[in-house]
Amino acid sequence: MRTLRITLLSILLLGMGAVASAQNGKCLPMRTDGVDPYQPGERIVFNISYNWHAVQTDVAKGVLTVDQQSLNGEKVWHTALNMQTAPFFDVFFKIRETFESWFALKGVEPRKFHRDSREGDYHAINDYIYDRRAGKIHANVEYWDKDKETLDIPYGDCTYDVTTLFYYARRMDFPNLKPGTVYKVSIAIDKEVQTANLTYVGLENKYIRGIGTIAARKFGLSLKKGEVFEGNQDALLWFSDDDNRVPIAFMAPLKVGAMNGRLGSYSGLAHDFTALISPKKVK
């Protein structure tokens, strides 16, 4: 079951988070029209499934929520991602993941991060405080089999945590992205910063089971070949092509089969879901 743990965490990092970038030292361009793609009270549910030949089984669910809080006298966004395996799968391998981020109302500048991951007998806790002036992330990292470690992680202009990255991605300047452009992506997790390559593919109408057909922006993410991911293939990511920029799907090729995520339900969106061009008919 170690492979499942690595797979779900890797997909969480690469499929939902690693979309901030640096190209020639610059981050991926953000929209400048002042439109917020999310609002307090938004709730997005993702279904995560494993596919192998004719076998397709939902094994986990992720829930993303948004609100606003006060942090050290500053009003900030607070976002949370909670992921857990399905009840039937808990018998084989139980996963409970919580990721929380606090970031500035303007500019998505991170302030604080908390991670609590419980996966089988594995348990990890990350607590970050961002110090832009010092260029450091003050981190407390703890594992189930080790003492808590306090350290500083390098903090660059384009370095984010899992959930902050996800909401940064939703503020991308979609109209100015050019198909085929490759960006470097970075994300802080545990005691290090991880990188990969992100390629903007272009527009696509994507069918989501249970939801309908959605106009989307498609991205490819190059994954390092290893014990879980297959080499020479990209993970694929889709965001709705409207003012909400909702993540609607991802796919990551594995050594055996593939892991897929799809939008399951949504509520409290900041704008009309105009990207939903062909809703599923309710009988």
Where are these regions (language model features)?
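Positively charged n-region of N-terminal signal peptides that target proteins for export
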Residues: 1-6
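Bacterial N-terminal signal peptides
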Residues: 7-17
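Acidic, serine/threonine-rich low-complexity disordered tracts
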Residues: 23-132, 174-283
